[in-house]
């Protein structure tokens, strides 16, 4: 008789409470706060931070829903190795987000967004449930390090006349107190840009997509110019139906990936 093994791993993926703070007008403008394990997407397409995690969020709108805002902070949980669900363990990483949306900005049907994100990553040494070292990433000089990265972004989504437009631009700056490839502390200065334009004619949609993330031509100097996200999951240029976005590509059997699953950015993370 073959042995049958059972494994029970309790997880709580999403659970939150929401309080309605006040009404701002008779047109359903409001302010509210939500606390707990909750989903959050920092922009229209999930370019920088798109996750379900433990946090608190104040959000609302005014001006007949023309203006909307979010102010949120997340105390990130570790992910289960095999299911990728949230565990109850603290990851040692805090993420803060503030963004503002303006509907019908310049053109009717076009919504603009401005964002600020802070990634304060103090995660120490961590092995996954399969015994692999995943933090710090085993590439270059392997040593615990803290990363403070700050993102400024402008994004937009909607249509200008009959042309559908989605775009985003992010500048990230900050400091890594020990970069494994450089073997020294580095300052962060990197950029990302995305543009998707489409046009509908009868039953056909003609679409073109462009995505750019800056690289680092000299990873051993004191400036890190390669763009990386906090935890992206972009719905762009095919999103989860794109082979490049859906798959993570491993480097030579190590726990380091050229890029992560559900990401567009090559980042050498584990």
Regions found by a protein language model. Name each.
Residues 12, 16-18:
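Gram-negative (and chloroplast) outer-membrane scaffold detector with strong preference
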Residues 20-27:
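Alpha-helix termini
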Residues 215-270:
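C-terminal structural cap/anchor segments
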């Amino acid at each position: 008789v073959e042995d049958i093994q059972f494994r029970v791993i309790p997880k709580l993926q999403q659970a939150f409470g929401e309080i309605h703070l006040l009404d701002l007008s008779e047109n359903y403008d409001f302010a509210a706060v939500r606390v707990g394990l909750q989903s959050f997407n920092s922009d229209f397409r999930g370019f920088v931070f798109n996750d379900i995690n433990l946090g608190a969020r104040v959000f609302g709108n005014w001006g007949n829903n023309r203006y909307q805002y979010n102010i949120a902070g997340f105390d990130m949980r570790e992910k289960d190795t095999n299911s990728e669900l949230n565990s109850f363990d603290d990851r040692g990483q805090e993420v803060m987000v503030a963004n503002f949306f303006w509907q019908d900005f310049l053109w009717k049907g076009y919504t603009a967004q401005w964002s600020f994100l802070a990634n304060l990553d103090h995660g120490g040494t961590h092995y996954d449930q399969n015994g692999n070292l995943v933090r710090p990433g085993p590439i270059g000089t392997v040593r615990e390090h803290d990363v403070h990265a700050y993102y400024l972004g402008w994004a937009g989504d909607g249509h200008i006349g009959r042309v559908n437009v989605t775009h985003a631009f992010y500048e990230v700056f900050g400091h890594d107190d020990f970069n494994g490839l450089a073997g020294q502390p580095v300052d962060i200065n990197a950029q990302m840009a995305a543009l998707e334009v489409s046009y509908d004619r009868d039953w056909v949609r003609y679409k073109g997509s462009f995505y750019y993330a800056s690289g680092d031509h000299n990873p051993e100097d004191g400036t890190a110019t390669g763009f990386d996200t906090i935890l992206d999951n972009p719905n762009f240029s095919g999103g989860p139906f794109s082979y490049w976005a859906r798959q993570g590509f491993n480097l030579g059997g190590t726990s380091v990936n050229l890029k992560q699953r559900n990401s567009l950015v090559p980042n050498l993370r584990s």
